[in-house]
């Protein structure tokens, strides 16, 4: 079994397949696992196995996603593939599958199609930083000029959405033929194309910065006063590291405050430092309990700033998902749940959009009634009377 060999001593990268329906995303996913399994770097996963993706609930939204893992000589990969277009939209917006990079699958026989464009735009909006292209079904195209034409079209499309189209690696091949070869136990020309694709993914998509190496950020969940010691705030560290003696800022809701960390505790034990993923209590010097509240964040000074206006890419839940039963219109005022708290905000719809129906995916402008620590890529939920009616990601800070 290949399973025994899986080790964590290689850098870990999250990727996924994106692209138009029926262009071969799932077949490529199966082909990658099959070709790499011949080298003992993966377990072979069947097409049907990947296609019958289990439904998962992410923030109340039902998403069908397949997760597979495999290795190359250089890295360990977690790979997501979604059966339906709506699943991709939900996945990318909720951040259920954070991708460090994506493999865009385009059929050489059809060229870029509407969802090809939509997935590239979504990647730009939700912050998928790198795209590598696999031109699939190349076995069905005899004309080399036609392949070149499709490649040019793909590069133009990437450029249009501010991806470096001219420098993006594009590999042409056939996922189906590679899968057939691997199943027959043959290392043929089509399998070689899949290996070439994975080499490009290894080279072109950088290893992500580990959460502990990023700037410190901790959303505040609760505030306590400990007599004789001062104020303690608790929460789960989102990124970075915090040490006793660090100068930090408290950002959001009220004007930004600067203070010093005088203690870090986990499970009532004193620690030298807390790091990404830890649930900790942080003791703050000279900070009054009434100056701090849930919804603010502790952070490294100047690393994140409070904002009230932003553009976001959102998915609005269907009635079946527990969302609204009716559309909403311009100036709709729900609550925006960011990290640990709700803040009311008003929504401005894009020009020409009269209303938004449950199940829609739309770009909105939001103005909050109180400032919140925000940056591009911050996720939020849209709530109404305590229930989630939408999910979104900040695509641009406006003010």
UniProtKB/Swiss-Prot annotation:
The keyword Nucleotide-binding applies. Residues 174-176 are annotated as: G5. It is an enzyme of class 3 (hydrolase). GO terms for molecular function: GTP binding; GTPase activity; translation elongation factor activity. Residues 19-26 are annotated as: G1. PROSITE patterns: G_TR_1, G_TR_2. Monomer. Pfam families: GTP_EFTU, GTP_EFTU_D2, GTP_EFTU_D3. GO terms for cellular component: cytosol. Its EC number is 3.6.5.3. Mg(2+) binds at residue 26. Keywords: Cytoplasm, Elongation factor, GTP-binding, Hydrolase, Magnesium, Metal-binding, Nucleotide-binding, Protein biosynthesis. The gene is tuf. Residues 60-64 are annotated as: G2. It catalyses: GTP + H2O = GDP + phosphate + H(+). This is Elongation factor Tu.
């Amino acid at each position: 079994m290949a399973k025994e060999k899986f080790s964590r001593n290689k850098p870990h990268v999250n990727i996924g397949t994106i692209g138009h329906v029926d262009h071969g995303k799932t077949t490529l996913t199966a082909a990658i696992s099959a070709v790499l399994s011949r080298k003992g770097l993966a377990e072979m996963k069947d097409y049907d196995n990947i296609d019958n993706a289990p439904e998962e609930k992410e923030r109340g939204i039902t998403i069908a996603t397949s997760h597979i893992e495999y290795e190359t000589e250089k890295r360990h990969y977690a790979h997501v593939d979604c059966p339906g277009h709506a699943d991709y939209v939900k996945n990318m917006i909720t951040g259920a599958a954070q991708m460090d990079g994506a493999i865009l699958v385009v059929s050489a026989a059809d060229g870029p199609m509407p969802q090809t464009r939509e997935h590239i735009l979504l990647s730009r909006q939700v912050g998928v930083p790198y795209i590598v292209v696999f031109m699939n079904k190349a076995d069905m195209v005899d004309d080399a000029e036609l392949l070149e034409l499709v490649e040019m079209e793909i590069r133009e499309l990437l450029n249009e959405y501010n991806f470096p189209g001219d420098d993006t690696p594009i590999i042409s091949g056939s996922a189906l033929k590679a899968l057939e070869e691997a199943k027959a136990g043959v290392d043929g020309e089509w399998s070689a194309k899949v290996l070439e694709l994975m080499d490009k993914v290894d080279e072109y998509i950088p290893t992500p910065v580990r959460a502990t190496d990023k700037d410190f950020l901790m959303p505040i969940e609760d505030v306590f006063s400990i007599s004789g010691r001062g104020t303690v705030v608790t929460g789960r560290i989102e990124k970075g590291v915090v040490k006793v003696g660090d100068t930090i800022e408290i950002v959001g809701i009220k004007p930004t405050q600067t203070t010093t960390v005088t203690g870090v505790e986990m499970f009532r034990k004193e620690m030298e430092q807390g790091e990404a993923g830890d649930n900790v209590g942080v003791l703050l010097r000279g900070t009054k309990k009434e100056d701090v509240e849930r919804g603010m964040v502790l952070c490294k000074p100047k690393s994140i700033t409070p904002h009230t206006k932003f553009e976001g890419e959102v998915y609005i839940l269907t009635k079946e998902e527990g969302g609204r039963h009716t559309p909403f219109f311009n100036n709709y005022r729900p609550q925006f749940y960011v990290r640990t708290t709700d803040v009311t905000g008003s929504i401005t719809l894009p020009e020409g959009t009269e209303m938004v129906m449950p199940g829609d995916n739309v770009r909105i402008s939001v103005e909050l009634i109180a400032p919140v620590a925000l940056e591009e890529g911050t996720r939020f939920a849209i709530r109404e009377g305590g229930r989630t009616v939408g999910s979104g990601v900040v695509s641009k800070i406006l003010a």
